[in-house]
Design a protein with these regions (language model features):
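N-terminal juxtadomain amphipathic helix
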Residues: 1-69
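Conserved class I S-adenosyl-L-methionine
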Residues: 87-97
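Conserved SAM-binding loop of SAM-dependent methyltransferases across substrates and taxa
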Residues: 98-108
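Conserved SAM-binding motif I beta-strand of class I
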Residues: 109-114, 132
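Conserved SAM-binding strand-loop segment of SAM-dependent methyltransferases
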Residues: 126-142
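A conserved beta-strand element that flanks and buttresses the S-adenosyl-L-methionine
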Residues: 154
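A short glycine-rich, Lys/Arg-flanked "PGG" loop and its adjoining helix->strand segment in the class I
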Residues: 166-183
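Short, glycine-/aromatic-enriched active-site segment of Class I SAM-dependent methyltransferases
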Residues: 184-200
Length: 200
C-alpha cells in the first residue's frame, strides 16, 4: 500500500448499472467503500479495495454493448483496420459481452470469453463460439488445450475490472501466438477529465 496515494473518497456506493424497482427500495442495498488511489509504481489510478467480480458480473448483468451506437461504430472501424492490417486467422475476445465486436468477423475464427451467463446466452443463440468464465490462468489453459493459440487477442473495458493483472497477462501470454497482436481498450482518467465525462 505504500505506493498508493489516496486522493478521492466517494464513500459507500451501490453497484453500478443496478437500479431498484419501487418495491425494492425498502430492502437494504449492499454498498462498497470506494476510495480512489494513484499508484506511484505503475502510474495507474484505481480503487483502493476491489470487491468480488461475481457481485457485479453475474447472470443479472444489465449492460449490452450493442445498445451503444458509439460502441458499435467504434468496433466496426477497429475491425476494418484489423482485417486490413493484421489479417488474423484466429481471434479471442476477453469480455465479449453480446458479441458486438466479434460479429464484425467470421464466426468460425472467433472465440469470446464472457462471465455473465445471461449475456453469454445471447451470443450462443447467435451461434457465436462463447465460453462462460472469468479470465484467469485456469481458463486460459482450458482454451489452450482446445484452440491452441490466437494471432489476435482483444479486450475492451474488461481488464480494469480484474484484480490480479499479473495473472491476466500470464494467461494472455499462454494463448497469444508468437507473432500475435494484443489490443486492449480501457478508460483513461486523463481523457475523462479532459472531456468532463464520467466514463470513456
Amino acid at each position: 500500500m505504500k505506493n498508493k496515494i489516496e486522493f478521492l473518497d466517494l464513500g459507500f456506493q451501490p453497484l453500478a448499472n443496478y437500479y431498484l424497482r419501487k418495491n425494492q427500495i425498502k430492502y437494504k442495498q449492499k454498498k462498497y467503500r470506494l476510495i480512489v488511489c494513484f499508484n506511484k509504481y505503475n502510474n495507474l489510478v484505481s480503487i483502493k479495495k476491489t470487491f468480488p467480480s461475481r457481485s457485479m458480473f453475474n447472470d443479472q448483468y444489465p449492460y449490452r454493448s450493442s445498445m451503444s451506437k458509439t460502441m458499435k461504430n467504434s468496433f466496426k472501424i477497429l475491425s476494418d483496420q484489423i482485417k486490413r492490417k493484421i489479417k488474423p486467422k484466429k481471434i479471442l475476445e476477453i469480455g465479449s459481452n453480446d458479441g458486438s465486436f466479434l460479429r464484425n468477423f467470421n464466426k468460425k475464427v472467433t472465440v469470446g470469453i464472457e462471465p455473465c451467463k445471461n449475456v453469454e446466452k445471447i451470443t450462443k443463440k447467435q451461434k457465436f463460439n462463447t465460453i462462460p468464465g472469468y479470465w484467469d490462468l485456469k481458463l486460459a489453459k482450458k482454451i489452450q488445450r482446445k484452440y491452441d493459440s490466437f494471432d489476435l487477442i482483444y479486450s475492451a473495458n474488461t481488464i480494469t475490472h480484474i484484480k490480479n493483472l499479473d495473472e491476466v497477462f500470464k494467461a494472455i501470454n499462454l494463448v497469444l501466438s508468437k507473432n500475435g497482436v494484443l489490443i486492449i481498450e480501457d478508460p483513461s482518467l486523463l481523457e475523462c477529465l479532459k472531456r468532463n465525462t464520467y466514463d470513456q
